[in-house]
Amino acid sequence: MARLAEKNNLLKPLILSNDVKYMAQNANTRNNIYPNIDVTDDDPENWDYTFNIEKKNFYTYYASKDRVNPSKKIVETLNKETDPKIILQYLKKINKLEDYSDTEALGILTIDNKINTQGNFGYRPINLVYNIDESTVLKIKENIKKTSGIAVNTIPIRSYPNRYVASHILGYMGPIATEAEIEKYVKKRDYLRDEIIGKAGIEESYQDNLKGKNGKSLVTVDSSGNRKETISKSPSEPGDDLYLSIDLDLQEQAEKSLAGVLDAIRNGHAYESEYGLFMPIRRAAYAESGAVVVSDVKTGQVLAMASLPNYDPNLFATGISQSDWESLQVEEDSGPLVPRPMLNIASQTAVVPGSTFKLVSSLAALEKGLDPQAINTCHGFLDIGNRRFNCLIWTEKGTTHGEENLYGAIRDSCNYFFYCLALGENPGDGRSVGVKLELNDIRIAAEKLGLDKPTGIEINIPKEATGNIPSINKKIEVTRLMLKNYLEKELPLHLKNDVKKSKSEFENDVVDIVNFTDDPESWTRKKILDFLDERGYDPERILEGKRAGLADTIKYTYLNQAVWDITDMLNIVIGQGQNSYTPIQMNRAIATLTNGGYLYKYTLVDKVTNHDSQDVLFNNVPEGNRIDLKDRKYLEDIKYGALLVAQNNKILSQLPVEIGIKTGTAEVEGENADGVKYDSYAWMVGFAPYDDPEIAISIVLTQGDTSYNASAIMRDIVAKYFDLDVYTTNTGDTKANVDRGQIGDNPTREIGDIIENLNPNDLKKEKQNNGAN
């Protein structure tokens, strides 16, 4: 048949018929088929970025309205102009908008441009503004005719009645914007180009479930794309209902307690909740952010995940304004610890865990054969070469813990005990401790507890961070990167006065020096001095504000760190060094240690149901496996040590429910914007109740100074979950008498005033001074 049509010259006219072309194009569109444009014969030099093309089209459109100057010349001039005010004034002039303010004119031009870019799709409505009030609606109806093409419609918009609560879980909405979103939603899922979609969090992950189906109107249009007649309509359909695992009351408590404690320790006043009073021992002047995670240890369901600062997702419901977006951002060079509202600390920030990691080291030691009852004497400190490693009790009081077994070492957070596990012996008396922990032992234990991978929560954007289990290769990689960054910034400053170098010469020198790390021990101080001198640098000049010259910095700060030695293990077993994990990863590790050894995939979703029928479309079933252990009693040994820690905490020991906790204080390098060194991260992890754990809790306070500061948050979470009638205080605790294991694990930096003598009776006055009701 085809050959017969071709022979009689019928095929080509049929294919090229406008009616047939329209039918084919319509069929393609209905089936979501968008034929690719063949550009293989085009010269790549003629290609341009979409943004540049759109800008040129914008200028060309408005240049055509200028009746005096040639369009081509206007476009060239506008493209070169960098001052947006000058461009706006020109556009106001040719559009006869000079009597309007810049803001009004910009609004008019924006609407005009939106209409122009519709092209042949003029029948598709353009959303000009959302959430207008009733008075505006009345003005539109009174002053604008129905035939003008402008109408007020009611459309569903996402509303978040609890505003900031769980914002990092829910995520936010926004219009389709990126090329990836156009490909994913417009081309593959038949979305309209200007639809609002989930951009982050659960909103993004479950976009297809939550969206439902758009209503449709079949219309006829004229040659300009204007709607002439509506042939048929089909109503929109609501999306599915999604139920989270989050306990709203617990989530609100976590956020409220986190905010209250951060404010109290930052400003040096008491924190009070319905469950008690907390008096900070000292100020933590830079404590402005933190996170709390609460999970069901028997299912892996996340019951609460708080991160501060947070944001109001209502700002994004119809597309966020530029000013609101900018208010949520921070300067790029403001430092890694500056509070960031858009950052979910709970799942995105992997930090050093401090002594909370001693529970992981304990599991590794027990698996290797440690007798938890065996006595090991703490001597306060030990020396490795010219470096001293202390227990905090020695640093602050000049005393020791004396005889310790594993339970006591966990309770007292005894660094010395864990140092001995890494050494295989007690250097104070030369006695063997029965086991010697190697790096691989730590790695195996950490991997069993899931610290090498994400927890599995259903948030694709922003992606959940993966922590870092220490390794020799990673240490060398990190050292090389740090040395490279240092040299790129500092090397030119050490150039001799009579020497000049090009950028490429500096780059070659940086590469050569970084390669010293391939064999760091062969690069003696003298060899480095000679190398730098030969390359035209002053190797011993100490710049203002620095403590060492170029050669000594390269040798002792970087090259010495490129060699793995026993001091690395001493840091790792107490949770320092290369260890870094997110709060939700640490939460899963604690849950696994206390639920009988089950490592669950974490989830934020309980179920998905059909909106109309309420039929269950998806019901979340716990996913987990039991980790391999030589003896499950090891888990009870670790739990018991954590119980002793809680019993030593004045606030938590008053609870009617027995719980287990582990504290941690982790040092971090760097400075705040005012030049003051970063304060420590404050950690606390725990579980409750002790006998048959139901929940795991992890808390981290950025620059929180001491883990003791997390006590009130832990109390509030436990009390809220178990609906306890309790009011506990730490009145009487001072810096002098509080248990060392509760204060922290590292020498602390004094920031701000000692506030231990603050009178609890002044609480009401403090609240009044801080604007509380």
Could you tell me what each predicted segment is?
Residues 1, 140, 169, 253-257, ...:
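Active-site SXXK
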Residues 301-302, 599:
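Hydrophobic "anchor" residues
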Residues 122-130, 155, 191-193, 237-246, ...:
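Second-shell loop/turn segments in exported
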Residues 310-334:
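A short, polar/charged loop-to-alpha-helix boundary motif
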Residues 755-773:
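Long, low-complexity, intrinsically disordered segments
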Residues 1-239, 243, 248-291, 297, ...:
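Membrane-proximal periplasmic segments of bacterial cell-envelope enzymes
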Residues 155, 159-161, 166-167, 171-181, ...:
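Active-site beta-strand/loop architecture of penicillin-binding DD-peptidases
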Residues 372-410, 456-535, 539-553, 559-560, ...:
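Conserved active-site-proximal loop/helix segments of enzymes involved in bacterial cell-wall
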